[in-house]
From Swiss-Prot:
Biased composition (Acidic residues): 20-35
Superkingdom, natural source: Eukaryota
Start and end residues of each stretch annotated as Disordered: 1-43
Protein name from the UniProt record: Uncharacterized protein DDB_G0268276
Amino acid sequence: MFKSRIETGGFQFQVHGDDESAMDDEFIDDDDDQQVVEPVTDN
């Protein structure tokens, strides 16, 4: 319904519709989780 530009991790992409927004939110959560797991695995 509405088009908005979201910046995450230096990546720019257009999201339209609530469905896309939900997917974007999940991606951000996954990225954060991965970042936390990365140092743990390295350590």
